[in-house]
A protein has these predicted regions:
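Short hydrophobic alpha-helical segments enriched in small aliphatic residues
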Residues: 3, 15-18, 24-29
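Zinc-dependent deaminase
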Residues: 11-14, 32-75, 139-219
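Short beta-strand scaffold segments in enzyme catalytic cores
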Residues: 83-88
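A cytosolic small-molecule/anion-sensing beta-strand core signal
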Residues: 89-90, 117
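Short beta->alpha transition motifs characteristic of CBS
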Residues: 94-101
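A short, polar/charged loop-to-alpha-helix boundary motif
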Residues: 103-113
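Immediate flanking context of iron-sulfur cluster ligation sites
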Residues: 125-138
Length: 219
């Protein structure tokens, strides 16, 4: 029997349809089904970058951006655009995610959106008034708007996006004079080179693939 192929599913195992009570039952059961779970997309080029392991003693911007960077590497390994986000409140990580647009086939499944949803669930409310989000690339229009609406206290991003960024790159939603919320904004300077190198390497490899012409203009 041929294993089903699908994006991100390169590990398949036969498992019983019903949980056996004893080893003997497991050995003699004939009704097995094939399942798969994502490990790495089958055609994804290996990620040449390593995760960061910052010291736990200093919980500064570089520490939390390192966690976001690690999320971005996880995205690469799933053949997603390598962008990661981490949300922190009172020194505690309350949201952590990376892009899942391709795997979920959901255009809203950006790292920031998923992290915001996690954080709101963790806090039991949608207002993230005391939270800081660290994200490896400047948020797009959708994510920038969501950050305004979530009342986040501060946004710190690593790489400016002059093409689609909406917090200083192509536009700045945080500067709208009639908006009912404005947050503190740190634009670049925190693991900026590392996050830019990761993104550029990903799209460089993608452009080498047949039929691929995507990318993000990072200046």
């Amino acid at each position: 029997m041929n294993a089903p192929r699908g994006r991100g599913f390169n590990s398949q195992f036969y498992v019983p349809d019903a949980l056996p009570l004893r080893h003997r039952e497991f050995a003699h059961r004939g009704d097995f089904r094939l399942i798969g779970f994502p490990v790495a997309a089958p055609d994804t080029p290996p990620c040449p970058f390593q995760k960061r392991f910052p010291s736990q003693l200093v919980r500064d911007d570089a520490f939390y951006m390192s966690l976001a960077y690690n999320q971005a590497i996880d995205a690469w390994r799933e053949d997603e655009v390598p962008i990661g986000a981490v949300i922190v409140s009172a020194g505690e990580v309350i949201g952590s995610a990376h892009n899942r647009v391709e795997g979920a086939q959901d255009p809203t499944a950006h790292a920031e959106m998923l992290a915001i949803t996690q954080a709101a669930s963790r806090l039991g409310g949608w207002r993230l008034e005391w939270a800081t989000i660290y994200v490896t690339k400047e948020p797009c229009p959708m994510c920038s708007g969501a950050l305004v609406m979530s009342r986040v206290k501060r946004v710190c991003y690593a790489v400016r996006d002059p093409k689609m960024g909406c917090l200083g790159g192509a536009a700045n939603l945080n500067d709208l004079p009639r908006s009912n919320h404005h947050f503190e904004l740190t634009q670049g300077g925190v693991l900026e080179d590392e996050c830019r190198d990761l993104l550029q390497a990903f799209f460089r490899l993608k452009r080498m693939e047949p039929g691929e012409n995507g990318g993000v203009d990072l200046g």
